[in-house]
Amino acid sequence: MKLLLKNAQIVNVFTDRLETANVLIDDEKIIGVGGYDDSDADKVRDLSGKIICPGFIDGHIHIESTMLTPSELAKVCLPCGTTAIVADPHEIANVCGLSGIAYMLEASENLPLSVYIMLPSCVPSTGFDETGAVLEAENLAVLYKHPRVLGLGEMMNYPGVLAEDPQVMQKISEAHEFGKLVNGHAPLLGGKGLDKYIAAGISDDHECSTAKEAMERISKGQHIMIREGTAAKNLEALLPLFDEPWSRRCMLVTDDRHPADLINEGHIDNIIRRAVKAGKPPLTAIRMATLQAAEYFGMKGVGAVAPGYTADLLVLDDLKTVKVCDVYCRGQLAVSDGKVIDFKKPEIRSDIRKTVRNSFYLDELSPSDFHIEPEGGRCRVIKIRPGQLLTDEWITEINFDRDNGVDTQRDILKLAVIERQLNTGHKGIGFISGIGLKKGAIASSVSHDAHNLIVIGTNDDDMAIAANRIRTMGGGNAVVSEGKIIAEMPLPEAGLMSDLPAAEVASQNEAVRVAVHKLGASAEIEPFMNMAFLSLPVIPLLKMTTLGLVDVDSQRLVPLFEK
């Protein structure tokens, strides 16, 4: 059946112009843009001057970080105008291995939202991570033939690239042999090190926190993903990239974003809105969110309103608010007047579901498990940078005579990362600054990328209660104060995702967020999202794993106590 969308203003992403035209669609494809009339179609819709633009593409997202299953994420993203995402399932792969990747492929099959996959490159991220699985190059090879697999996901182990680690280089070369892209992840890397990283065949990065850093990469041929997530907020710093000549090498991504933020603020549409509000050209922002992402990833016939292109289209009220009225996915109406039209949820094989549902293996913990035996007074403390995933090393005097080193007046709290997938009993314990808790404890099974149990608290008793609640729930988030659980959020899918509708997940997420802030958490941070990255030993500078503190730049374990 042919559909005519007439009397529309078309966003031409090839020319950065707004043009008056009609759009003729046949099945999944656009077959004409121009002076078509009612006689050319079986069905006609008069848009009365509204705007048609291509569907938005999120070029880098971890579905697991939304805490939603793929079908629930689709219900949230589609009304925001997102018709395609490029997902790296390295969160669930670290927990469940190949079964985790299979889960993501099956759970996203035939959704109105097109879900493409980048295969996880670093499972584990480095040798300092203890994960539920290890994926080598030979494990990934068979998956490159899947039609929705576009390449190798973010190569976080940039020290391995610089050292020419054989396994790392094999993964990169194998992706290239299949004609696939390799995503980058190398925060703060510059100069000769960056040259070597790019020369290895890594063609993009989403970790830039300054315009200068991004411009160096663009000038050396990389594509830049401008990220605005829940914890990592780089849009403001990277606004100069919306200008020429930089914009032609950029796309828009969220990376990690919580459901409440998706529902309340939006997705890629939110990034476009904020860029426009900051004075950047709306057509440039839309091009970055559509055609440039599609062309970079090799999505043929996607990302434009033009003959031969897939009819992934948005109907907008205007370019200032980017308010999405309707969404067409592959020629079918998926969102009408802001409401998602029901679609069938994909089926997942029972063996895959069983693996994902049983990922927590850990003995009960006691307060003594969080005790630190003093070996001196000067300690390394991880210091959070608000609005960033980067952390600093703070060496300071710790008074162990009171509260075993915790000092809420100086914002020094305890941090523990405990292995939860193989029951090794390994744990790293130290101190964290920048969270701001005045009492209580918080715990989560979401701790990038190994997703072991992570706990922050003001006292050992509450830390043990919070940790054990995560254990009994089979994963999730918990907030404890004065011996009582005051908020919790179960995440039974690999300890990473909920099985509830998006609105309920957002409500639970907001409840734990509010509870943490009532305990004194800093208003400058998103506590659970920031906490989740404190164990990722590939983002500078100091991180905590189950093996202890890691100096990311030197890729070595460092002692808690500074002798």
For each predicted feature, which ranges?
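Active-site microenvironment of metallo-dependent hydrolases
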Residues: 1-21, 25-29, 36, 78-80, ...
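Short, ordered loop/turn segments at secondary-structure junctions
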Residues: 89-92, 120-122, 157, 187-188, ...
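Divalent-metal coordination cores built from histidine and acidic residues
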Residues: 74-179, 245, 486-490
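Active-site mouth loops of central-metabolism enzymes
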Residues: 58-69, 124-136, 203
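Histidine/acidic residue-rich metal-binding segments in metalloenzymes
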Residues: 134-154, 160-225, 232-253, 263-284
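Residue-level marker for buried hydrophobic side chains located in beta-strands
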Residues: 4, 55-57, 117, 252, ...
